[in-house]
């Protein structure tokens, strides 16, 4: 495992725990898109269907368990534990416009036409756009809390570091996964505007807002 993947995993874990801690400490999920979190739960479920059949390392298995468990814990807190604080009026992105096309694309463009491979490919495609409901929600409300901004920034850094991970693997291992690279590029591009606003506003103590 190279340094970029490790740092990417650390950034991803940081994003997850920032979000969980924010919800639990404030006893509120205001400003958090339940739809994005539900999409992430679908992503990790589809990606790690091999959890009990394909053992690579303790680290790999542990990360899979953490991602799946934390995604469902987040969904549970939003839609059950702190449901009264969930802002469903602004969380209105039509997620079927993300799920259906990525599912179809996974059937058409994949590495191997087997159930596990199709589900894995679907998870890669869906993850690349899963943050859209959250960004859409921020644009509708006009601003995001600082802690929510930190969460989004950590997610964006995770995807950017994973792009460097793919470059590293191609350079030193000769490994090239076009599906993962293209999906990672799409996801990173979605964060570009947010990155700029994060640096120019949030780091200067101002609230972040996205154009409606």
UniProtKB/Swiss-Prot annotation:
Stretches for region Interaction with the K-D-E-L motif on target proteins: 47-48, 159-169
Residue ranges of the region described as Important for recycling of cargo proteins with the sequence motif K-D-E-L from the Golgi to the endoplasmic reticulum: 204-207
Record localization: Golgi apparatus membrane; Cytoplasmic vesicle, COPI-coated vesicle membrane; Endoplasmic reticulum membrane; Endoplasmic reticulum-Golgi intermediate compartment membrane
Cytoplasmic side: 25-32, 80-92, 136-149, 200-212
Positions marked as site (Interaction with the K-D-E-L motif on target proteins): 5, 117
Any one annotated GO CC term: endoplasmic reticulum-Golgi intermediate compartment membrane
BP GO terms, sorted: protein retention in ER lumen; protein transport; retrograde vesicle-mediated transport, Golgi to endoplasmic reticulum
Transmembrane segments annotated in the record for this chain: 5-24, 33-52, 59-79, 93-110, 117-135, 150-168, 179-199
Site (Important for recycling of cargo proteins with the sequence motif K-D-E-L from the Golgi to the endoplasmic reticulum): 193
Membrane topology: Multi-pass membrane protein
Keywords annotated in UniProt: Cytoplasmic vesicle, Endoplasmic reticulum, ER-Golgi transport, Golgi apparatus, Membrane, Protein transport, Receptor, Transmembrane, Transmembrane helix, Transport
Function: Receptor for the C-terminal sequence motif K-D-E-L that is present on endoplasmic reticulum resident proteins and that mediates their recycling from the Golgi back to the endoplasmic reticulum.
Protein name: ER lumen protein-retaining receptor 1-A
The organism of origin for this protein: Xenopus laevis (African clawed frog)
Source lineage: Eukaryota, Metazoa, Chordata, Craniata, Vertebrata
Annotated gene: kdelr1-a
